[in-house]
């Protein structure tokens, strides 16, 4: 199972997180977010991680135009794109065509379990679906969990990741109920926006080791 630690900003923290075995790292590229990082800040982090190979580095965008996305990515060496806004399946397909070398993740923010019906429209447009909790004012990192029991029948024909309020304290409960292909944590392992709590990240590693599911 893949584990993404999202909302990184500080090179030293990113190095420590990678050293713990977390090789999927997320960077918030939405200017309105308190976790926003500029292309230059992202590159400073990535340059500090050259000792770690096979990293998956994902930029998180929301409702960005294709030209703006192209401009941002041209300034970084990110190898993944996460769309976390109201992007249509058609737009996702355009992004996939424009950036075929980048893994494309589409986040669906669920207000109710019936919102899962929207997922099918994205099956052929993206590489990964991510399920997150809906918040009217925040796109992610809200600390709110999804109703895990209601997701037990979700079996899309492509990889899917679970997000939304995951912490070292509840990750085992979530994974005892569900079998996602990945999980995504942000606020659950930080002490402030984009300021990761390395003790919590280590606790997360210990919890996942107990389940023997962390992908190496």
Residue ranges and their predicted role:
Residues 1-216:
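Conserved N-terminal beta1-alpha1 strand-loop-helix module at the mouth
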